[in-house]
């Protein structure tokens, strides 16, 4: 249930909050089925994708002084997740109104109960959704990223 009595959203919104300057999205990975509840119990699949990671652009990695494999913390208005940085040209900054906007991406196949290291990316996502379908909004939300350690 996404709305309290009286129809007000129960979530914390963080649009244009300078503490969370980067756009984040979530996605699946080929190696783990959906949330990973079945595939994370298979050793050969865990060997391929053993832990939570966050894809970041080469440009953002330089800006934040991060290297591939560095431990990082991703935070939003709703929570924090620990992951490993995956510096990649797959994710690139884009321009909005002459401003550079960085985007990061996290898989949502990690969680609490099965093997594998990492928190669920859904700890960061808002619990709002379409009023008619109740489909949650997990594809665009604001985060910050910093080195751990």
Which residues make up each language-model segment?
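Long, contiguous, secondary-structure-rich segments that constitute the structural scaffold
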Residues: 19, 28, 35, 39-149
